[in-house]
Amino acid sequence: MKKGSRHNFVVSQENWTLHRKGYQDQRRHQEKVKEAIRKNLPDLVSEENIIMSNGREVIKIPIRSLDEYKIRYNYDKNKHVGQGDGDSQVGDVIARDPSAGQQGPGKGQGAGDQPGEDYFEAEVSILELEELLFRELELPNLQQKEEDHLVVEHIEFNDIRKKGLMGNIDKRRTILSAIKRNALEGRPGLIPIYNDDLRFKTWNEVVRPESKAVVLAMMDTSGSMGRWEKYMARSFFFWMTRFLRTKYETVDIEFIAHHTEAKVVSEEDFFSKGESGGTICSSAYRKALELINEKYDPARYNIYPFHFSDGDNLTSDNARCLKLVHELMESSSMFGYGEVNQYSRHSTLMNAYKNLKDPRFRSYVLKEKGDVYRAMKTFFKKEEEAVS
């Protein structure tokens, strides 16, 4: 460029490769997947892929509200209509969908001639679902009890000392100390640095008291609990255990399975083994009271019994159940009863509980898979939500 020229030139470098475009498309797609997960959370929570994953970090789940992009052929072969600058008014019908009255994909027994629904199968981490589900949940009526556990919440570096680990050296304060000492000795500057100039950051553990709690998970495993009923109950308890272990460090969980008799079982047996026989729900409540008397003093523990059944209890046992539920509530922060009743049939147990007015008693009837999510929201809703 000639001397004295007034023209200014700016050399810029921009990434015009396809890699940048691909990254933007990928990020936009991930945002769409997350939005679809939020909208479909009630259905996704009870997906069999999740419940049977044994807590694996990443799983594949179908998201039916997110289409798989592809070229579709127009089978109607009709001429299409556009809207121009004519004399049309708001509300005028400009065209009708010729396929509006046709039969779509359904769930009937006969064979159809329509294409099925396309859906996107996304890889989702359990942690993502937990973050969305657990953010609105908490143990209700959690109170401070005797002999609370002290839990280390975090570490604070809030003190400076002359002795410590070299990994915790405070460089800024060490340099300032050396400069001040050298200046007082008439040698302005940083060097030399002596051991007496070294400053180290030290920490304190910030602890908070956390009340102890125990959840008594009771499940009906009798013959009347079919495969779907047991799957729904186990789906709820699957998310309940993950919720408790994610948000609370001092919560014990006891697993009780019952038919006509109740017994304390391991977590693995609770989620995998099936049984048969009749149904006497009071046996589970008696076993829960035994555990409370033997191991969980109400003065030291917040107690939360949860019972899931299909409601098909021995009629003569309902009065005993009602009496034992009252006894459990006297020592509990909340009692939760979930009933898996897909076809709204008559339930002898829910009929006995319908007049319970104690605020510590909460119940929910599960009729479809999405009700697992709604039951979690009912039993573990936050206090401000409960008040409002």
Swiss-Prot record:
Composition bias type Gly residues, residue spans: 103-113
InterPro entries linked: Spore_YhbH, UPF0229
Protein name according to UniProt: UPF0229 protein BH1031
Family to which the UniProt record says this protein belongs: Belongs to the UPF0229 family.
Region feature (Disordered): 80-117
Domain of life: Bacteria
Organism: Halalkalibacterium halodurans (strain ATCC BAA-125 / DSM 18197 / FERM 7344 / JCM 9153 / C-125) (Bacillus halodurans)
